[in-house]
């Protein structure tokens, strides 16, 4: 296969593939994290808080990165997935972030516009700065209780996303 045109690119693509991504936006965000030298990147990381399980898109150490697309706040009738008013979806998202970050995790948020053009470089710098703050506050290593809970959730809970 070494002489097939494009085989080197195909091998790189396969090496970067991750079945945990739930959207192209998550895949592009994960690729940005890899390009920034952050890693390893864990996809769909479960955080169990107060009897609820919240699934974070991406995790590097104690830092989470969430990709935010508008589809989660747009109604089903308008091509989205939200079955509740946008105000309720956004309010729940805020409560979710507060609960997750209360467990000793930092978080960055990324949207489509952050992944292209001049904003991509600025987003990379912002994520590196936010990740550095998380490392300073919480260290590099995921606390054992979070790692243990995540392992248990992954073994016993079917993967489920809510809008």
Residue ranges of model-derived segments:
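Surface segments flanking catalytic/ligand-binding clefts of nucleic-acid enzymes
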Residues: 1-163
């Amino acid at each position: 296969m070494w002489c097939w045109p494009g085989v080197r690119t195909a091998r790189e693509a396969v090496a970067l593939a991750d079945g945990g991504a739930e959207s192209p936006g998550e895949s592009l965000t994960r690729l940005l994290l890899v390009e920034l030298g952050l890693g390893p990147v864990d996809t769909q990381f479960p955080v169990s808080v107060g009897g609820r399980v919240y699934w974070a898109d991406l995790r590097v150490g104690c830092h989470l990165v969430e990709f935010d697309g508008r589809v989660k706040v747009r109604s089903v009738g308008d091509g989205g997935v939200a079955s509740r008013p946008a105000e309720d979806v956004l309010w729940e998202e805020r409560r979710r972030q507060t609960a997750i970050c209360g467990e000793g995790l930092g978080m960055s948020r990324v949207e489509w516009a952050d992944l292209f053009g001049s904003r991509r470089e600025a987003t990379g710098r912002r994520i590196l700065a936010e990740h550095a703050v998380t490392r300073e506050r919480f260290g590099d290593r995921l606390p054992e209780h979070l790692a243990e809970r995540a392992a248990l959730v992954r073994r016993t809970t079917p993967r489920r996303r809510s809008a």
